Regions:
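Conserved catalytic core of sirtuin-type NAD+-dependent deacylases
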Residues: 1-209
Length: 209
């Protein structure tokens, strides 16, 4: 049986009501990336950053996985260990839909961790009323468990191994702008995978698909 690896981006969650980053009316409109999605921005103004991510977390709780999320779950149920899913999304909709072999490379909106002792928490365990939530263990500042610009994504070693060994690489709803994910298709093709792109608009890395 062929091994299938899927990569999803913000476009797959648009039908659920999650606004995509770069569309008109998207989450980045009227906000500077460096202010709300960088370590430097968090150091400058943690209140602003937490305000942004509390809004995103609340939005993610108000929506449901859509038919595209469910289709990938069914594909996984059919293929078993021959299917794996990488997502750039942090909305947790794949996990809520039932995806098991899942790599959330940019983190999760429902998680945070202490900047000092590194203790991880689910958002539902935390008191989000303060402008800047604090660690229950050491009292220091918590930050959203999100990979910001300039930080290293999660699971890169595991993802590289999957890219080297997949037969089919499926790309769904991603702009092909954000690296390293935008370069995954090149790695997959280099190691012989067939690549399939599903997107409403031509992604920036279309030449490699």
């Amino acid at each position: 049986m062929s091994k299938v690896l899927a990569l999803t981006g913000a476009g797959i969650s648009a039908e659920s009501g999650i606004r995509t980053f770069r569309d008109a009316g998207g989450l980045w409109e009227n906000r500077k990336v460096e202010d709300v999605a960088s370590p430097e921005g968090f150091k400058r103004d943690p209140v602003l950053v937490w305000e942004f991510y509390k809004e995103r977390y609340a939005q993610s709780l108000s929506v449901q996985p859509n038919s595209a999320h469910q289709a990938l779950v069914k594909l996984e149920e059919h293929l078993g260990d021959d299917f794996h899913l990488i997502t750039q999304n942090v909305d947790c909709l794949h996990a809520r839909a039932g995806s098991k072999r899942l790599y959330e490379m940019h983190g999760r909106l429902d998680s945070c961790f202490c900047v000092s002792c590194r203790t991880h928490y689910r958002m539902e365990e935390c008191d989000l009323e303060p402008q800047t939530p604090l660690c229950q263990r050491c009292g220091n500042l918590l930050r959203p468990d999100i990979v910001w610009f300039g930080e290293i994504p999660y699971f890169l070693y595991e993802i590289e191994e999957l890219l080297k060994n997949t037969d089919v690489f499926l790309i769904v709803g991603t702009s092909g702008v954000v690296y390293p994910a935008a370069g995954f298709v090149m790695t997959a093709k280099l190691f012989g995978a067939h690549t399939i792109g599903v997107n409403l608009e031509k992604p920036d890395n279309m030449g490699f698909i």
